[in-house]
Amino acid sequence: MSERDAVVGIIGLGAMGRPMAEHLLAARGELHLSGRSRRHRDLEERGATWASSPRELAASADVVVSMLPDLPQLEAALDGPEGMLAAGRPLLLLVASTSSPTGVRALAERLASSDARVRVVDCPVSGGVDGATAGTLSIMLGGTDADAAEAARILAPCGTPVHLGPLGAGQVAKAANQLVVGATMLAIAEATVLAERSGIDVDRLWTLLAGGYAGSNLLRSNHRRLVDEDYAPGGLARYMVKDLGFAADVASATSTHPSLLPALRDAYAELVDAGHGDDDLSVARRFVAER
C-alpha cells in the first residue's frame, strides 16, 4: 500500500490538530477525524469523515496521527472497549504530541508485546499555531527507517519532516527545542519589561531588534502579543512545565548537568502557580512584570 493509498486519521483537533487536519485533508482528499466533540463539521463538508470513537477511527484508518496532549490521553484512546486497539487492525501510530522519550519507547514495547499490530513513530512538531496554520511546522521523527519514511510522506503537507534516529529521537529533539523556546521566551519577557520601565517603546524596540542577533521566529510570531499584552492561548503556558520536565529527564539519562534548565523549570512552575497556566506562553511578560 502506498502512502497515498493509506487511509489516514487524526485524533485531537485542538489549536494544533485542527490546522494540521486541514492540510492533510487538502492534500489527500479524505481524512478520518476523532475528538472530544463534533465541532468541525466544515471539515466533513470538505470530505472528512467523523469517527464517533477511537475504535471507529482505527477501524477505518491505516495511519493515525495523535495530536492529543500527552501519552496518558493517548493510552486512554488506545485501551478499553472503544479504544483503537479494539478495532483489531494493523496501524501505524504517529505520536505528534510532546511526550517523554522513555514513555514513547515504553508504549511501543507494550504494544509490541501484545497482540496489537501497531507500529509507532514519534513525530512531535514545533512552530506553534502559526506554523500549523501555514503548514510550515518542523516535524521531528523517531522510528525505523521504513516507518519514518512513511510518516514523513504523510506529514509533509504540514511542514518539514526530518528523521532524526530511532524511536524516541523525535521527543529528545523536541525536549531540546523546548529548552531553547522556554529560555528565549523568558529572556524576551524580561527584556520587554526592563525596556518598558526604562521608557522605551517596546513595539519600536522589537521591530528594530528583530533584524539583529536577538531576532527569532519566536519573537516575530509573538511581537504583537507582547506589545498588545494579548495572552489568549495559542499554546498553553502550563505545557512548558511538562516539556521542561522531559528535558530534565533527558539530561539525567545522558549525564548532562545543565545550569539553565533548573532555573527555567522553577520560573515556569512559579508562572503556573501564579495563575497563568492557561494563558499563552507569551504571558511570561506579565509574569515578569508582576514579580
Residue ranges and their predicted role:
Residues 31, 50, 119-121, 162, ...:
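Hydrophobic beta-strand scaffold residues
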Residues 1-66, 129, 157, 162:
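NAD(P)+-binding Rossmann beta1-loop-alpha1 motif at the extreme N-terminus of oxidoreductases
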Residues 169-291:
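Helical "substrate-binding/catalytic lid" subdomain
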Residues 20-24, 107, 194:
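Hydrophobic residues within alpha-helices
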Residues 8, 77, 98-179:
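Rossmann-fold dinucleotide-binding core
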Residues 54-118:
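Rossmann-fold NAD(P) dinucleotide-binding segment
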